[in-house]
Design a protein with these regions (language model features):
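Short, charged, surface-exposed hinge/linker loops at domain edges
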Residues: 1-11, 39-77
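Short aromatic-glycine-(Arg/Gly/Cys) micro-motifs in beta-strand/loop hairpins
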Residues: 14-28
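A short, exposed loop/beta-hairpin motif centered on an aromatic-Gly-Thr core
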Residues: 29-40
Length: 77
């Protein structure tokens, strides 16, 4: 029987003023990262999540992550 994993939501939002992607999560206390590259930011979160969860006393082996990205831009006519 497979173990049920808890799914964490990580929000990846483009900050147009700073020209960076920002990662935050209500499920992961302390997670605030930024990067100019979406791929690089996702890679950074993969390493940060287990560390932050361990600091909060949560076993990261029973977790999965759902990344949600959002970027708003004006339409160029």
């Amino acid at each position: 029987m497979s173990e049920i994993k808890m799914e964490l939501i990580v929000n990846l939002i483009w900050d147009n003023e700073a020209a960076v992607w920002v990662a935050t999560s209500e499920d992961i206390p302390g997670l605030v990262l930024e990067s100019g590259s979406l791929d690089a930011l996702m890679e950074r979160t993969r390493y940060a999540i287990p560390e932050l969860m361990a600091l909060n006393g949560i076993d990261s082996n029973k977790l999965s992550v759902c990344y949600r990205s959002e970027r708003h831009e004006p339409v160029i006519a």
